[in-house]
């Protein structure tokens, strides 16, 4: 199998992007790049250092002094910030509720996108996020856009939170996910939207395995 194609998986919060992308990357022996984790890592540092999330200059200054590293392991992808393992803490409710506010700043996205493109320059990657197919990797050989209802996405996030031991309330999650959709869709730079050449998959009533199998069919068609 050719090892140099780039697979972009986009979609709104809790549509199943990361879960599916990890499995696809493992099957293809590709590098998995969780762009959302990079924004979460910066958000975590900003919250820790009490940087105002609406202060774009302060955030870009913080980012330029923050080393974010994604590492593969037996347990999956690990996220490090300046040498500290933040894999689990960046999934906290506090970070989750704040990450869209950080990601909407144009200069923050510009710096992150430069880092993401550098990681993907040699191909052999599966990258997920909100704007991979439209902005980060517009020439990706395979582009997928996952979607699901707000209710279904809230249920999934609720189950994830419970599994991680985080406090969780389903009705609150529905509101938060709808709010994040609005912020992500209306932001000035690279808003959440389906690339014209992306294949859309509604995951509301599909299992993870069914979504993975559908994407693998598409990948095999493109590289066959």
From Swiss-Prot:
Keywords tagged on the record:
ATP-binding, Cytoplasm, Kinase, Nucleotide-binding, Transferase
A Gene Ontology biological process in which this protein takes part is: nucleobase-containing small molecule interconversion
Q: Which GO terms describe its molecular function?
A: ATP binding; CMP kinase activity; dCMP kinase activity
Compartments reported by the entry:
Cytoplasm
Q: Kindly indicate whether the keyword Transferase belongs to this entry.
A: yes
Any one annotated GO CC term? cytosol
**Residues noted as binding ATP in the record, renumbered to the chain:** 11-19
As for family, the record states:
Belongs to the cytidylate kinase family. Type 1 subfamily.
Record's protein name = Cytidylate kinase
Organism whose genome encodes this protein = Geobacillus sp. (strain WCH70)
Name of encoding gene: cmk
């Amino acid at each position: 199998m050719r090892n140099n194609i780039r697979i972009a998986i986009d979609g709104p919060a809790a549509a199943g992007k990361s879960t599916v992308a990890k499995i696809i990357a493992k099957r293809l022996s590709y590098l998995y790049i969780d762009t959302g984790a990079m924004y979460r890592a910066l958000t975590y540092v900003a919250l820790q250092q009490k940087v105002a999330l609406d202060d774009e200059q302060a955030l870009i200054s913080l980012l330029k002094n923050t080393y974010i590293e994604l590492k593969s392991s037996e347990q999956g992808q690990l996220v490090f910030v300046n040498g500290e393992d933040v894999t689990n803490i960046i999934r906290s409710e506090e970070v989750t509720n704040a990450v869209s506010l950080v990601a909407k700043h144009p200069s923050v996205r510009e710096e992150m996108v430069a880092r993401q493109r550098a990681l993907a320059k040699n191909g052999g990657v599966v990258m997920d996020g909100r704007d991979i197919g439209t902005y980060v990797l517009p020439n990706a050989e395979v582009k997928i856009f996952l979607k699901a209802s707000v209710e279904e996405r809230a249920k999934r996030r609720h189950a994830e939170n419970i599994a991680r031991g985080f406090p969780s309330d389903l009705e609150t999650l529905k509101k938060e996910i709808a709010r994040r959709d609005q912020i992500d869709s209306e932001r000035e730079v690279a808003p959440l939207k389906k690339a014209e050449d992306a294949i859309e998959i509604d995951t509301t009533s599909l299992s993870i395995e069914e979504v993975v199998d559908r994407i693998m069919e598409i990948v095999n068609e493109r590289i066959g």
